[in-house]
Amino acid sequence: MKKLAISIGDINGIGLEILVRSHEELSKICTPFYFIHESLLDKASKLLNLKLFNAKIVAFKDGKDYEFNFVKKENSLEIYSFYLPLDFKVDENFEIKAGEIDTKSGLYGFLSFKAASYFVYEKHAHALLTLPIHKKAWEDAGLKYKGHTDALRDFFKKNAIMMLGCKELFVGLFSEHIPLAKVSKKITFKNLSIFLKDFYKETHFKKMGLLGFNPHAGDYGVIGGEEEKIMEKAIAFVNAFLHSKKDEKFFKKALKDENLQKELLLNFKGKGVYLPHPLVADTAFTKTGLKNCNRLVAMYHDLALAPLKALYFDKSINVSLNLPIIRVSVDHGTAFDKAYKNAKINTKSYFEAAKFAINLHSKA
């Protein structure tokens, strides 16, 4: 079976309860390695009145050699150690504060995530599944990252792409956790062309559409000009480049050379993988709109995620593309209001994420 490295997220939220409640079923489809120390797992288990049996847990420690070792078997748990450069002291001896933003739980969740990421990178597991973190807890802990995807870019020096959804609808985000006021400045021919090229090469979706940035997709330039001045040009260029089968070196050269762009367009005949014009966002998510195209790109976060979660909240997942590792996540937050209350918690997104990672690795 495929091996999944699972980071615990913010332990003050619902992540650990999802992990414990789902372990038996999850173990039927993969071999999970949970990145949590035994002492902290014991505290959480007592609060939840739930016990984790027949599981593998990894105690992550600061070190230089990425060494992975079996330590012992105790109370049906297989305990391992994994050493990596962490830049922070690992503190597992803190109190769990259910439903609260806390610097210690924020930092611990980050270190669990970093260790699990490199565990996969070092080929000890096939994919990474992350449970939800709290961004404010990360910030209060002195971390510079806005979330998992932002951190993965830094870890691996790659331009990670965030994609969310399910088989009925997937959406790639051109911009993620940045203020709305900064999005328009990010939309340039170069930035968008690189994104569209990379998004296709990671997904190989056969038909994709870009959601317009402005209301009514700009109404032929009446409302803003990004659609006609930038987006349509980037779409045409990327469609022509993908059709040409030329290499990455040519792409980088053509980005700066209008004559090469014109040459590509002259030689391009037929349909591209991207629809030629941006879609009007307020109708793209209707039944008719999704029947036409259900693989979309959004210029900013809420343009896509508000309708996606309204339609498919329970089954949507988060996928990080364009990285040297496979990373998936649940598409929901820490749910502090439900943490450690034995509330009814939906685990569908968790299982969908695990299945997606397993299938993606099988196709790789």
Swiss-Prot record:
Catalyzes the NAD(P)-dependent oxidation of 4-(phosphooxy)-L-threonine (HTP) into 2-amino-3-oxo-4-(phosphooxy)butyric acid which spontaneously decarboxylates to form 3-amino-2-oxopropyl phosphate (AHAP). It catalyses: 4-(phosphooxy)-L-threonine + NAD(+) = 3-amino-2-oxopropyl phosphate + CO2 + NADH. NCBIfam families: PRK03946.1 (NF003040). The active site is located at the dimer interface. Belongs to the PdxA family. Its cofactor is Zn(2+); Mg(2+); Co(2+). Pfam families: PdxA. Homodimer. GO terms for biological process: pyridoxal phosphate biosynthetic process; pyridoxine biosynthetic process. GO terms for cellular component: cytoplasm. It is found in: Cytoplasm. Pathway: Cofactor biosynthesis; pyridoxine 5'-phosphate biosynthesis; pyridoxine 5'-phosphate from D-erythrose 4-phosphate: step 4/5. Its EC number is 1.1.1.262. It comes from Campylobacter jejuni (strain RM1221). It comes from the Bacteria. GO terms for molecular function: 4-hydroxythreonine-4-phosphate dehydrogenase activity; cobalt ion binding; magnesium ion binding; NAD binding; zinc ion binding. A divalent metal cation binds at residues 177, 216, 301. This is 4-hydroxythreonine-4-phosphate dehydrogenase. Keywords: Cobalt, Cytoplasm, Magnesium, Metal-binding, NAD, NADP, Oxidoreductase, Pyridoxine biosynthesis, Zinc. InterPro entries: PdxA_epsilonprot (IPR037539), PdxA_fam (IPR005255). Substrate binds at residues 148-149, 309, 318, 327.
